[in-house]
């Protein structure tokens, strides 16, 4: 764009760019230099000489000016003549400028030439040409021939490209070319100069008259023209902008009518600017001799202004009032930007920033400045020309300077975006709504914008946006790329692509980049509409409902919900430089608003679902919704792109209804993301980690109502409804945790809440994890519980409300950080997860029946488990578990449901209990299982196998296996929420599947084996982090089968079934592909001891008691554990992992080592992968061991204490770091992400002090792969061998097998104890 010569010129050198250019530049520049003294106006590149020469050239050339305006002053100027002479190539320039105008490439060169010529001959060309060009631009505008206008139009197009030199040079060149077109007979350069001199001195200098009106005379101009030229350049900068604007006839557009209204604005500013800032007196005093560069600067920046002003000025001499108007704008722009600071940068540099965006700026500028562009973009121009002049010139310049506004077919959109001068007008998406949405009325406008967005259309955008959109786009400089895309989808996509906005931390942060785009991409119209809505809600954090809507929905669809869709389209970002979107996402009133709006959103979502939108979509959205404020923040911070990734999956999975739902959900969700990024309000909320809890509370509120109604709706009044809806409701119940709230919202959330949380893995992991835990238990309660324990589900909602609410609060805190950093990967995983969830949702309908058996404990446990499942599923889903189990957190409900369903045939009650317990806690499931013992366990095992295998083989069993996998996944989720989480979860799922596959072997063991999976599953379900091992143990047989299945589905090497005899080290090495020190795996022994303690404790508790203890540990700690588990998962997910996971994990790690060791041993210890699971499973295992050990009292207390501590620590850490600073938060998120991933890997080692980092990684990997393979193989073998023992352990002889399991589990817990890692 800028040649060396341009740079030299900009720096004051007069490069001989062309033979003519050097000639003119030289002659002009030299004249500037040598004529500078002569004119005494060397300020302007020999400006005086320029004035004199230009006076002559203009007089002679101007005489021939076709344009009377330029001819009227007939500014023949020797200099201009000289310029023409020196620019004899300038004749080429003029001629070629025509070509250059016609061809942007030439324009670039010509622009450079002009820039150089102007800068070189700035004295003559700069002031005179600027004036000339201004006058000529104006004269051309109203008096130039159409071809000249077209040339100007061409210049406009080309200037858009080479806005920098192109714009102001084009202005000069446009004048020259226009004059050339007019006065082709005349010397091209001189003609342009002359005509310009005539008209421009007359008009422009009249406009600048205070300084140069008398000087407009050729001699008067000589002296004053240098000054006016100095002004002129500044004015011309803007004038140039309009001239080249996409209006071939910028100068020739509505010559007088638009110019007087619009151009006069720049003209007057040019006048005033020229007088005030650019005027010979001002610029001269300002810049003195440096005026040369200021001339360049004027040429570059003021050039656009001056171009505008000049065109306006030249055209409407009597439009001085407008000039007066524009001067403030232009002057504000010019003085700040065109003055020494702006001038300091060479005009070349200066101009391009303006000019590059100027194509858009030009668009708005002409819009403002003149209708010349009105012809081009009449709708935009008028509006833009109206608003832009007043505040947009600065924004305009910003547009110019900010080529950020994409030079896409929709300049109006870019203008508003680029015009960030307004500030927080986050209208990055669509011009229409941008136009509708003003800073003053973002909520209504965003609402309207949503409507308008629905009816988005470049024309509409152009027409509506110009005034508002321009400014709002100015406010959101990043927005340009978003709004630039004419298509809504593309706009949204562009906004998602403008994830830099998030990165910029600008309002656009969350707006388009994060979720809007994905959703928009989801459904162009919906996305755009949603984008508008999100902006509306986010744009004005003060608007609670839109915000809460946005918070609930934005989040649902904005970050996480849009993770897949947005990721695809945006990855954008999110990209996903989702650095700070999430800060904005949480709305202050979100908790309150979320309660209502969330309910409303839930209602809407439910309505959408009811409308036939996939429940998965709604669930996804809801889970995103739940996660919206906190997790969305976090993901906006770190995982916007991940969310987008998830969103595309979500969009893919729920594209049918998701896209249908997306508009609503998006518009509901978008505000949140907008809030996250849109206000830099996001910055307001970014600090508000409380909003994380807020959001979780909001989620609680929204999901709570949703959950209860879901129970009521799904379960009818009772939670007995079902399946997907019940699960969804349960999810929301988990989120809501409030009997009252749950009931109201559930109907709406039925199809969407559970699905939404299920889907939004990130949220599921964090806030949604709790929600899903609650939902899982709610769903479990709902399905079977509806029959046996409908109330408990409600009770669960209520009793767990306190626990879960606390958890939710902390989870919210956690959610923010946890979801933020870790959720980048988690979001990505969730994209996959959601897809799987979508698949699973087919089977997940009845996933919550089984949970209901243990609604009371399911309350807590299901919450925990549900959350774990959710996290696991979400984590696992991304892991690539094609199994439906991962597909949806609902799957975890489906898991319990599947089990419930599977057991249902045999023991509808028992299995729901046993499955529910297995899923939620052994309390009920264990007693049932142990009471039902063989049958339940057997059937459960069968059903586990069936469910897992079916899940593996048949959708329903797959659904069921998915929950198991999901439960296994929570270990990973907790342990390794990051990149490894996919594999980890997948490995966990696969390992679980492998275990499950071996479960048939265990099934051969009869009830014990089956019971163990049942117990394990409940433990896994209950202890998201801890149960995974149990889950795996439970799922060993199925794990094997499913391992193959998942291998098929996920093509994971890790899925390869591992020989049961394969040693942990071998498995770890095989999975990790690296040598794993046995010592790193040795924590197994240590864990064995630890586990033995809890296991005897569990044994002492008695099979049912131990299991029930585990259940109670989960049930009791459910609140804590939900908190802890949720926290643990959150922590694991990343945010809590490093800060929270450490503090709470340490105490829990001990218990986890004891308690966790056993369950982990069951499922995880056999495999190093399991160890990493242990990293996540340690918590689970800890819970499990709590359960197992009769640490029901100790464990729950400790767990309660730990969760409290964890929550406190989390809150402190989450509240503290996020509140510290967004950047700090973002850094922290990234740090946490890295640390979480590393800790997920290293937490294995950190968990067991003896475990080395390589083992951490190995265990992490082994936990991923081995979790899949080892779990399938060694755990399989171990469980195959010990499952009966473990089953007995569960059934009554948990000590030995559990000890065995504990050995492995303990080492696993130690090796992978996230708390230890976190503590580290």
Curated annotation (Swiss-Prot):
Residues 255-267, 338-356, 404-415 have a biased composition (Pro residues). Pfam families: JCAD. Residues 1-124, 183-202, 209-233, 252-426, 452-492, 676-720, 741-802, 835-942, 1085-1116, 1153-1174, 1275-1320 are annotated as: Disordered. It is found in: Cell junction, Adherens junction. Residues 849-859 have a biased composition (Acidic residues). The modification Phosphothreonine is found at residue 484. GO terms for biological process: cell adhesion; positive regulation of blood vessel endothelial cell proliferation involved in sprouting angiogenesis; positive regulation of cell migration involved in sprouting angiogenesis; positive regulation of MAPK cascade; positive regulation of sprouting angiogenesis; positive regulation of vascular endothelial growth factor signaling pathway. Residues 108-119, 308-329, 1292-1303 have a biased composition (Basic and acidic residues). The modification Phosphoserine is found at residues 486, 851, 1027, 1033, 1245, 1248. InterPro entries: JCAD (IPR028221). Residues 58-71, 95-107, 369-378, 454-465, 741-782, 865-877 have a biased composition (Polar residues). Keywords: Cell adhesion, Cell junction, Phosphoprotein. This is Junctional cadherin 5-associated protein. The gene is Jcad.
């Amino acid at each position: 764009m800028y040649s060396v010569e341009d740079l030299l010129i900009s720096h004051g050198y007069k490069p001989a760019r062309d033979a003519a250019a050097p000639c003119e530049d030289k002659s002009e520049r030299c004249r500037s230099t040598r004529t500078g003294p002569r004119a005494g106006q060397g300020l302007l590149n020999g400006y005086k000489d320029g004035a004199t020469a230009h006076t002559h050239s203009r007089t002679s050339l101007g005489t021939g000016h076709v344009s009377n305006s330029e001819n009227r002053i007939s500014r023949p100027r020797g200099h201009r003549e000289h310029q023409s002479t020196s620019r004899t190539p300038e004749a080429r320039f003029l001629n070629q400028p025509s070509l250059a105008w016609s061809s942007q490439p030439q324009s670039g060169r010509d622009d450079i030439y002009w820039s150089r010529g102007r800068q070189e001959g700035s004295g003559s060309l700069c002031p005179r040409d600027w004036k000339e060009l201004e006058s000529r631009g104006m004269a051309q505008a109203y008096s130039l021939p159409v071809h000249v206008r077209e040339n100007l139009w061409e210049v406009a197009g080309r200037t858009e490209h080479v806005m920098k030199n192109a714009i102001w040079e084009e202005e000069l060149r446009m004048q020259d070319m226009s004059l050339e077109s007019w006065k082709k007979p005349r010397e091209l350069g001189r003609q342009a100069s002359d005509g310009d001199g005539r008209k421009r001195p007359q008009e422009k200098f009249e406009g600048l008259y205070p300084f140069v009106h008398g000087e407009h005379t050729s001699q008067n101009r000589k002296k004053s023209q240098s000054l006016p030229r100095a002004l002129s350049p500044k004015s011309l900068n803007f004038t140039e902008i309009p001239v080249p604007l996409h209006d071939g006839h910028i100068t020739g557009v509505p010559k007088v009518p638009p110019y007087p209204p619009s151009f006069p604005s720049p003209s007057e500013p040019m006048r005033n600017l020229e007088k005030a800032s650019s005027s010979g007196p001002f610029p001269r005093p300002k810049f003195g001799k440096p005026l040369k560069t200021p001339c360049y600067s004027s040429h570059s920046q003021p050039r656009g202004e001056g171009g505008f002003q000049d065109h306006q000025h030249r055209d409407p001499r009597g439009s001085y009032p407008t000039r007066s108007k524009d001067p403030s704008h232009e002057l504000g722009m010019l003085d700040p930007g065109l003055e020494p600071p702006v001038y300091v940068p060479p005009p070349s540099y200066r101009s391009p920033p303006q000019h590059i965006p100027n194509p858009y700026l030009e668009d708005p500028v002409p819009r403002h400045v003149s209708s010349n562009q009105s012809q081009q973009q009449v709708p935009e121009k008028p509006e833009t020309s109206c608003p832009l002049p007043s505040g947009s010139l600065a924004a305009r310049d910003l547009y110019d300077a900010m080529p950020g506004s994409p030079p896409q077919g929709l300049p109006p959109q870019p203008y508003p975006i680029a015009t960030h001068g307004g500030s927080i007008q986050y209208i990055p998406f669509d011009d229409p709504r941008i136009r509708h949405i003003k800073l003053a009325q973002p909520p209504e406008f965003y609402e309207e914008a949503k409507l308008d967005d629905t009816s988005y259309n470049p024309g509409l955008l152009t027409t509506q946006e110009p005034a508002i959109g321009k400014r709002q786009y100015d406010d959101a400089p990043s927005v340009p790329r978003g709004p630039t895309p004419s298509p809504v989808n593309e706009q949204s996509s562009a906004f998602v692509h403008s994830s830099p906005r998030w990165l910029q931390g600008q309002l656009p942060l969350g707006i388009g980049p994060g979720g809007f785009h994905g959703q928009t991409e989801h459904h162009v119209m919906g996305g755009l509409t949603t984008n508008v809505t999100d902006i509306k809600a986010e744009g004005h954090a003060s608007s609670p409902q839109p915000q809460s809507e946005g918070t609930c929905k934005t989040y649902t669809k904005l970050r996480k919900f849009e993770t897949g869709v947005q990721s695809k389209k945006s990855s954008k970002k999110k990209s996903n430089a989702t650095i700070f979107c999430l800060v904005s996402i949480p709305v202050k009133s979100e908790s309150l608003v979320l309660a209502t709006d969330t309910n409303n959103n839930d209602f809407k979502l439910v309505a959408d679902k009811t409308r036939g939108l996939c429940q998965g979509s709604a669930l996804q959205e809801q889970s995103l919704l739940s996660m919206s404020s906190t997790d969305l923040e976090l993901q906006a911070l770190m995982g916007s792109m991940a969310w987008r990734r998830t969103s595309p999956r979500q969009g893919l999975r729920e594209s049918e209804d998701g896209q249908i739902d997306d508009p609503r959900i998006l518009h509901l969700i978008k505000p949140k993301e907008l809030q996250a990024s849109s206000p830099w309000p996001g910055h307001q909320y970014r600090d508000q980690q409380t909003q994380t809890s807020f959001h979780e509370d909001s989620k609680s509120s929204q999901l709570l109502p949703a959950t209860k109604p879901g129970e009521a709706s799904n379960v009818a009044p009772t939670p007995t409804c079902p399946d997907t809806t019940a699960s969804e409701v349960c999810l929301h119940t988990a989120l809501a945790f409030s009997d009252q709230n749950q009931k109201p919202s559930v109907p709406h959330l039925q199809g969407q809440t559970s699905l939404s949380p299920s889907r939004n893995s990130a949220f599921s992991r964090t806030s949604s994890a709790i929600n899903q835990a609650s939902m899982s238990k709610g769903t479990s309660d709902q399905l079977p519980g509806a029959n046996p324990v409908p109330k408990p589900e409600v009770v669960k909602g209520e009793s767990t409300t306190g626990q879960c609410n606390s958890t939710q609060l902390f989870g919210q805190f956690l959610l923010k950080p946890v979801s933020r950093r870790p959720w980048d990967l988690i979001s990505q995983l969730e994209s996959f997860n959601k897809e799987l969830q979508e698949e699973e949702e087919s089977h997940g309908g009845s996933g919550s029946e089984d949970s209901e058996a243990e609604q009371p404990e399911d309350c807590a446990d299901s919450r925990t488990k549900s959350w774990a499942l959710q996290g696991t599923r979400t984590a696992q889903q991304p892991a690539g578990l094609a199994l439906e189990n991962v597909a949806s957190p609902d799957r975890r409900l489906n898991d319990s449901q599947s089990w419930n369903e599977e057991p249902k045939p045999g023991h509808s009650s028992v299995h729901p209990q046993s499955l529910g317990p297995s899923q939620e806690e052994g309390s009920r499931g264990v007693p049932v299982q142990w009471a039902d013992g063989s049958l339940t366990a057997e059937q459960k095992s069968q059903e586990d196998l069936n469910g897992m295998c079916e899940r593996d083989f048949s959708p329903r069993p797959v659904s069921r296996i998915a929950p198991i996998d999901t439960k296994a996944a929570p270990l990973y989720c907790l342990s390794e929420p990051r990149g490894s989480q996919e594999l980890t979860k997948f490995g966990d799922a696969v390992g679980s599947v492998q275990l499950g596959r071996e479960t048939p072997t265990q099934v051969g063991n009869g009830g014990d084996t089956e019971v163990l999976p049942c117990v394990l599953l409940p433990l896994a379900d209950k202890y998201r982090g801890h149960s995974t091992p149990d889950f795996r143990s439970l799922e060993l047989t199925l794990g094997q089968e499913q391992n193959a299945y998942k291998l098929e589905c996920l093509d994971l090497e890790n899925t390869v079934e591992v020989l049961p005899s394969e040693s942990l080290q071998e498995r770890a090495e095989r999975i990790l592909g690296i040598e794993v020190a046995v010592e790193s795996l040795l924590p197994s022994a240590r864990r064995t001891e630890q586990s033995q303690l809890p296991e005897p404790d569990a044994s002492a508790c008695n099979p049912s008691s131990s299991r029930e203890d585990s259940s109670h540990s989960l049930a009791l700690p459910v609140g804590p554990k939900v908190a802890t588990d949720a926290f643990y998962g959150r922590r694991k997910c990343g945010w809590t992992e490093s800060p929270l996971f450490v503090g709470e994990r340490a105490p829990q790690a001990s218990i986890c080592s004891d308690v966790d060791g056993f369950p982990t041993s069951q499922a995880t210890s056999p495999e190093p992968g399991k160890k990493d699971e242990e990293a996540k499973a340690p918590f689970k295992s800890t819970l499990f061991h709590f359960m197992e050990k009769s640490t029901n009292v100790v464990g729950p207390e400790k767990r309660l204490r730990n969760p409290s501590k964890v929550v406190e620590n989390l809150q402190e850490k989450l509240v503290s770091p996020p509140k510290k600073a967004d950047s700090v938060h973002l850094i922290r998120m990234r740090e946490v992400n890295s640390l979480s991933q590393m800790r997920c890997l290293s937490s294995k080692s950190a968990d067991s002090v003896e475990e080395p980092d390589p083992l951490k990684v190995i265990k992490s990997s082994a936990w991923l792969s081995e979790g899949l393979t080892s779990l399938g193989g060694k755990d399989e073998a171990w469980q195959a061998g010990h499952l009966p023992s473990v089953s007995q352990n569960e059934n009554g002889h948990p000590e030995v097998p559990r000890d065995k399991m504990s050995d492995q589990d303990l080492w696993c817990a130690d090796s992978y104890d996230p708390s230890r890692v976190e503590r580290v």
